[in-house]
Amino acid sequence: IREVSKGKLFSYGKKVIIIGILLSVFQQFVGINVALYYAPRIFESMGAAKDASMFQTIVMGLVNVIFTVVAILTVDKWGRKPLLITGSIGMAIGMFAVAGLAYFDIIGISTLVFIIIYTASFMMSWGPICWVLISEIFPNKIRGQAVAIAVAAQWAANYLISSTYPPMIEFSGALTYAFYGAMAVLSAIFVWKMIPETKGKTLEEMEELWKKQV
């Protein structure tokens, strides 16, 4: 039974499975859940008072909602790939800027501005669109198993990134944020080179696409 199941899973080749896993991993490795879980601590480490850091966290929450709506309104108009690449570039700019501010120990509203740029970029792209792509790229025959693997990879990546943030930030705040910025750059390259555009394509068309690549 296991051999049959394994054969079915790889009936369209391993590439589509690997792409699904990497899509999930990159969604977490850009550091979004660090920004969400540790937002007050990040702002306090940059010199904000406790009350101010909580207010800034609330602002981030509003940004999350607004730019998720932006993604909903634009995903079928602009396509998945352009939004993902644009989001990756925005996240990279935000994280590298925060890394620079941390390195030079610059405290002020600029930190909030660049974290908002980072968060907004994620929420208009990788936040919702990763899930859209996971539901669209896998052929019907393997969708159940493939989606389960991609989701498992996402939770594993989430745990890894979230649990390593405290020791990383203790070692170097600048390098920590630069790492997330670098992951954002890699995610843009990954989407550009590896992800097929699914806008306007039927599940049958996606199935044929993967068949040709086996």
Regions found by a protein language model. Name each.
Residues 1-214:
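Alpha-helical transmembrane bundle of multi-pass membrane proteins
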